[in-house]
UniProtKB/Swiss-Prot annotation:
GO molecular function: histidinol-phosphate transaminase activity; pyridoxal phosphate binding
Gene3D superfamilies: Aspartate Aminotransferase, domain 1, Type I PLP-dependent aspartate aminotransferase-like (Major domain)
Subunit structure: Homodimer.
Organism: Geobacter metallireducens (strain ATCC 53774 / DSM 7210 / GS-15)
This protein's UniProt keywords: Amino-acid biosynthesis, Aminotransferase, Histidine biosynthesis, Pyridoxal phosphate, Transferase
CDD domains per UniProt: AAT_like (cd00609)
UniProt record, GO biological process: L-histidine biosynthetic process
Reported cofactor(s): pyridoxal 5'-phosphate
Enzymatic reactions: L-histidinol phosphate + 2-oxoglutarate = 3-(imidazol-4-yl)-2-oxopropyl phosphate + L-glutamate
Name assigned to this protein: Histidinol-phosphate aminotransferase
EC nos: 2.6.1.9
Post-translational modification N6-(pyridoxal phosphate)lysine, affected residues: 212
Domain of life: Bacteria
Enzyme class: transferase
Amino acid sequence: MIPLRQNIASMKGYIPGYQPPDIASWIKLNTNENPYPPSPEVVKAILEELGPDGAALRIYPSASSQKLREVAGELYGFDPSWIIMANGSDEVLNNLIRAFAAEGEEIGYVHPSYSYYGTLAEVQGARVRTFGLTGDFRIAGFPERYEGKVFFLTTPNAPLGPSFPLEYIDELARRCAGMLVLDETYAEFAESNALELVRRHENVVVTRTLSKSYSLAGMRIGLAIARPEVIAALDKIRDHYNLDRLAQAACVAALRDQAYLSECCRRIRETREWFTTELRSIGYDVIPSQGNYLFATPPDRDGKRVYDGLYARKVLVRHFSDPLLAHGMRISIGTREEMEQTLAALKEIG
């Protein structure tokens, strides 16, 4: 018998969105990827780093990602000591649990949101407590003083779409005895963010990713912004060469090209609003979204039926079997052409 830890043997593990092998033949709207390529400056930086013969790849990358921390600090208005780079924001989420929640201690998060928080907690042997949402998009039953070691809040919420108001998040930070982690994966698509709370509260951490708005999901680049003492703790336990040379070069170029980022986000927001209106015109219930996706429910509330119909037409969206979500689908925002084709497919399915 293989001597697995009991918590590992009994856990289910996280199931990511499906990546079809023949991806070019699909309209892929299931994992909130950006429909536009990364900045041309990113491609240029990667080629320059690679060089004519790839010799640079034989040398380890910067272990500290110091240049990235400096560029991110300039962009967000923080000293580099407040920033840590990561192999996708998932690495930071994992290390936050490792740093702050011992076996048997509690972490919490909103359900529905990113269920991977629970998976990471299970690996650590931490206890998981989930909280629902009220009709006015507040956390149901959240205590006046939450004693869990880490509480994760995805804002904008995924898969639903709305953001939590800044003043409400500020209140949550005061009510959390442990760390409040604001997962701002989709912040660049939203009207506001909560970065200012990092300065206001010593227990607030904001995580960001370059996977969505910067079109770099294939390179796995993330970061966290927090007080220097929190960053120093995370730095102790991260993988020491966690970002490869090409990813570091790409990240610097992407963060510096804010004009390109702004234009991509503008186009996605514009398409999101158009698609919201079109879905409602055919009877769908659509939650107003601040992300690059919509959660939409068909008139008969049978999300699986519509998902299957789209799948048969090679349009891939995300359906969740969770009873709280099974009535609808999360649909990533693609190009205008992709969304027009998706709308036509939905009208065919009925």
